[in-house]
């Protein structure tokens, strides 16, 4: 009887302590969704701006905006950035050095540092 009571109390404590897992999971997924949207917006803006030497700025800005969403946004930014660089591979014609520079801009933005470090002079202020 004591064993049964102990197991019941232990499971009750574990259940009470785990009540936040669903909310935390849903928050993470929402942050990831919004972060992916931030990444898409930066990509769309980069294509629209079509401004020479601005890609690093948009990499940093997309990652920065996504990371502000929280851990889910950071995760989405990292996954999308890594996937883009992996899929693009050498097809951009710019080589490994450019890919490494893109990843540095990605990390800079994800770490919460100002993406304007990479902003080229003359880029339209709307970006």
From Swiss-Prot:
Q: What is its main location?
A: secreted
Mind listing the GO biological process terms from this record?
A: acute-phase response
Residue numbers spanned by region Disordered = 89-127
Pfam families from the xrefs?
Answer: SAA
Asked if the record carries the keyword Transport, the reply is: no
What Gene3D superfamilies has UniProt attached to this entry?
Serum amyloid A protein (1.10.132.110)
Q: Which residues carry this modification: Pyrrolidone carboxylic acid?
A: 19
What the protein does?
Major acute phase reactant. Apolipoprotein of the HDL complex.
This protein's UniProt keywords: Acute phase, HDL, Pyrrolidone carboxylic acid, Secreted, Signal
- Could you identify this protein by its name? Serum amyloid A protein
List, alphabetically, the PANTHER family matched: SERUM AMYLOID A, SERUM AMYLOID A PROTEIN
Q: Quick one: signal sequence residues?
A: 1-18
Q: Which organism is it from?
A: Notamacropus eugenii (Tammar wallaby)
Q: Name one GO cellular component term.
A: high-density lipoprotein particle
Hey, what tissues is this thing expressed in? Expressed by the liver; secreted in plasma.
Q: Where is the composition biased (Basic and acidic residues)?
A: 104-127
InterPro entries, alphabetically? Serum_amyloid_A, Synovial_Prolif_Regulator
Compartments where found? Secreted
Family named by the database record:
Belongs to the SAA family.
């Amino acid at each position: 009887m004591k064993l049964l009571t102990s197991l019941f109390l232990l499971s009750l404590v574990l259940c009470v302590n785990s009540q936040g897992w669903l909310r935390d999971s849903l928050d993470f997924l929402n942050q990831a969704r919004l972060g992916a949207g931030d990444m898409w917006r930066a990509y769309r803006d980069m294509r629209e701006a079509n401004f020479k030497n601005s890609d690093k700025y948009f990499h940093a800005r997309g990652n920065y905006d996504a990371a502000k969403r929280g851990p889910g946004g950071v995760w989405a930014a990292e996954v999308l950035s890594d996937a883009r660089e992996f899929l693009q591979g050498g097809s951009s014609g710019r080589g490994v050095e450019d890919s490494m520079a893109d990843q540095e801009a990605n990390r800079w933005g994800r770490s919460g540092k100002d993406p304007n470090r990479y902003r080229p002079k003359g880029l339209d202020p709307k970006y």
